Design a protein with these regions (language model features):
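Sec-dependent signal peptide recognition
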Residues: 2-8
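Extracellular pro-sequences of secreted precursors
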Residues: 18-232
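Hydrophobic h-region of N-terminal signal peptides that target proteins for export
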Residues: 10-18
C-alpha cells in the first residue's frame, strides 16, 4: 500500500514539474523608483525568474509566462506577454516622455525549457459567465510574425486626476516574442527616465495642499512615485 502511494505521489510530482517550468535569469527582482521630483522620475526594473504554466484550449495546449511585478499584456488574440504597468503622479502642466537609458538582453528558446507556444491574450471573463460560452480568440497573422525587438518598448500617458493628483501610466515591455521560432528576448536590468516637460510646480503643490487628506494615504501609497506627493 505504501509503495503504491509512493508511486502515485511521484507521478503527481512529475506531472506538476511538466506543467510548471522556470527559467532562471541573471538578476534579482527589483521594481524601484530611484528618484522623483517635479522635473523627472528615474526607475529600475530587474527580474530573477520566468515562470511558465500550460494552458489548455480547444486549439491545443499553449504556455503562459510571467515575470515578477508584471501584469498580463498584449492585444487580444496576440501572444500574451508580461508587461510592467505602473501608476505614477504627473505634475500639472507637464507633458511626460519616457527614455530607456539602460538594459541588458538575453534570448531564450522556449522549447529548450519545455515551454510551448505562448497563449493568445483572451477577453476578460465575468464571474457569472460560463467559460464554455466564451470563444477562444487567436490572431493567426500575429503568430506568423517573425523577429525580435532590439530594445524594450516604453510609453507614458496622462490618464486623469484623483484628489488633486494628476495620474499617469508608465508601461514597459520587458519581453519580445517571436512565435515562429518560439523564442523570447528578455530585457533585464531596465533603467528608465520619465521627463516631466513643462511641469508647473506651483500649481502642483497648490492642488496637493488644497485637496490632501490623510484618509487617502493608502491610495497615494499605491503610486509608484508616491514620495513625490508625501514630500511636498
Amino acid at each position: 500500500m505504501k509503495k503504491a502511494l509512493f508511486i502515485i505521489l511521484m507521478i503527481a510530482i512529475g506531472l506538476s514539474a511538466m506543467a510548471q517550468q522556470k527559467i532562471q535569469l541573471r538578476s534579482t527582482d527589483k521594481s524601484e523608483c530611484v528618484s522623483s521630483d517635479m522635473n523627472s522620475l528615474r526607475a529600475t526594473f530587474s527580474f530573477s525568474t520566468i515562470e511558465a504554466e500550460d494552458y489548455s484550449s480547444d486549439r491545443g495546449t499553449f504556455s503562459w509566462i510571467s515575470l515578477p511585478n508584471t501584469v498580463l499584456g498584449g492585444e487580444v488574440g496576440n501572444p500574451q506577454v508580461p508587461v510592467i504597468n505602473e501608476l505614477i503622479a504627473v505634475p500639472y502642466g507637464a507633458t511626460p516622455r519616457i527614455e530607456v537609458t539602460r538594459y541588458s538582453t538575453t534570448d531564450y528558446s522556449l522549447e529548450d525549457y519545455g515551454i510551448k507556444t505562448l497563449v493568445p491574450r483572451q477577453l476578460p471573463v465575468r464571474k457569472n459567465q460560463n467559460l464554455e460560452d466564451v470563444p477562444f480568440v487567436m490572431n493567426e497573422d500575429a503568430y506568423q510574425t517573425r523577429g525580435l525587438r532590439s530594445e524594450p518598448h516604453a510609453a507614458v500617458s496622462v490618464d486623469g486626476t484623483m484628489r488633486g493628483v494628476q495620474l499617469g501610466k508608465m508601461t514597459i515591455d520587458p519581453v519580445s516574442y517571436d512565435p515562429v521560432s518560439n523564442t523570447i528576448r528578455v530585457f533585464n536590468d531596465i533603467e528608465v527616465m520619465v521627463h516631466f516637460d513643462g511641469a508647473d510646480a506651483q500649481t502642483t503643490k497648490k492642488m496637493l495642499m488644497k485637496t490632501y487628506s490623510p484618509a487617502f494615504d493608502a491610495v497615494y501609497s499605491q503610486l509608484f512615485n508616491n514620495k513625490a506627493i508625501t514630500d511636498v
